[in-house]
């Protein structure tokens, strides 16, 4: 991935261009990287909130200082998703190199304490957990941590493996290759199987206290098997992704060029960019015939199902994001559309 941060002149241009979308309600700061590492992150959040947008963001939690927490609250940020992949400090350090679990938990508690002092409900705290072979034993412990920090939701996602080594950590199931998930994986999908597989307590709920009322917390599990049902939340929710350099992409999965491994198959994804807000308006980009046609194809999911095709091991199309129906890019084996990899 190309590293960088959006300069404020470009951000102000984006903010002005968003006025062309009167039905736009939410702006989410996330993707690949840490939003709060931006040198003007808090100013960006304030400007978005002042413009009337519901703001949410992902963070690893290390930069949620007391000053940052106060800004998040005062700006009316709706949800903060904290990435926590373990409740064990040693496991956490292996996954989040350079991070300290105690520091992240302390930062969450500071945020919650400030909310209480200021008598406000937002931002809600959600814990995001990337499920892997090496931390699967930590998943049943997440509801307890969520209860302690006042989080009403634990959002679980599978790993997007960028290398063969990372692929060894994958737990979701692939047709014809039912690793540890068991022979009955296709016959027993859903929550019941998730509880059985990962030893979560039943029922998985906890009280998340917010001032004068109580929300019942829950774990939102990802899909753990490959299936024929596919849905793109990015397209169906009328979302677009704007990179730090102003480039516009339909989704996280196509915003950069990168390798990943799927069913022991190396795949190269090429970025799919429809334009750049620095040189043309987001409204014009959104209404380009190419973009309109792409959204139509994805809404109707006019793509083959590559993963359960008997010839996929000998198909050159599957090595890149193309397919035998002539789609380029192709969303045929997108992990997001399967609900296997999930984003807020």
Language-model-detected regions and their locations in the chain:
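Structured loop/turn residues at beta-strand edges in well-structured enzyme cores
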Residues: 22, 75, 149, 304, ...
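Conserved Radical SAM active-site core
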Residues: 1-56, 62-75
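Short hydrophobic segments within beta-strands
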Residues: 30, 58, 128-130, 309
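Short, flexible helix/strand-to-coil boundary loops that buttress conserved ligand/catalytic motifs
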Residues: 15, 68, 96, 252, ...
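Flexible mid-to-C-terminal extensions adjoining Fe-S/redox cofactors in radical SAM and related proteins
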Residues: 247-248, 253-344
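Short beta->alpha connector loops
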Residues: 35-36, 60-64, 86, 131-135
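Radical SAM enzyme [4Fe-4S]-AdoMet core and its adjacent flexible, acidic
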Residues: 1-2, 6-12, 51-54, 74-280
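Short glycine-/acidic-enriched loop or helix-start segments at secondary-structure transitions
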Residues: 38-41, 67-68, 91-92, 166, ...
């Amino acid at each position: 991935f190309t590293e960088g941060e959006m300069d404020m002149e470009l951000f102000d241009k984006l903010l002005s261009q968003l006025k062309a979308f009167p039905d736009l309600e939410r702006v989410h700061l996330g993707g690949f990287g840490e939003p709060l590492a931006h040198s003007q992150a808090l100013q960006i959040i304030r400007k978005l909130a002042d413009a009337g947008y519901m703001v949410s963001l992902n963070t690893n939690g290390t930069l949620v200082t007391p000053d940052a927490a106060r800004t998040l609250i005062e700006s009316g940020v709706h949800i903060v998703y904290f990435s926590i992949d373990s409740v064990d400090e040693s496991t956490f350090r292996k996954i989040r190199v350079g991070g300290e679990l105690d520091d992240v938990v302390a930062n969450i508690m500071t945020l919650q304490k400030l909310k209480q002092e200021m008598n406000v409900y937002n931002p809600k705290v959600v814990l995001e957990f990337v499920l892997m072979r090496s931390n699967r034993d930590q998943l049943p412990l997440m509801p307890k941590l969520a209860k302690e920090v006042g989080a009403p939701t634990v959002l679980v996602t599978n790993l997007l493996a960028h290398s063969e080594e990372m692929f060894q950590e994958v737990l979701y199931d692939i047709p014809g290759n039912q690793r540890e998930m068991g022979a009955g994986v296709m016959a027993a999908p859903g929550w019941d199987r998730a509880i059985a597989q990962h030893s979560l307590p039943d029922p998985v709920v906890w009280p998340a206290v917010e001032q004068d009322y109580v929300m019942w917390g829950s774990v939102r599990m990802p899909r753990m098997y490959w299936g024929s049902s596919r849905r793109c939340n990015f397209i169906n929710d009328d979302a677009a992704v704007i990179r730090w350099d102003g480039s516009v992409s339909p989704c996280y999965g196509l915003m950069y060029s990168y390798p990943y491994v799927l069913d022991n198959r190396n795949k190269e994804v090429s970025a799919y960019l429809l334009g750049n807000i620095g040189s043309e308006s987001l409204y014009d980009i959104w209404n380009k015939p190419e973009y309109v046609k792409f959204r139509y194809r994805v809404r109707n999911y006019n793509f083959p199902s590559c993963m359960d095709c008997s010839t996929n091991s000998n198909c050159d199309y599957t090595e890149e994001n193309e397919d035998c129906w002539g789609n380029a890019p192709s969303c045929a084996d997108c992990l997001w559309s399967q609900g296997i990899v999930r984003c807020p």
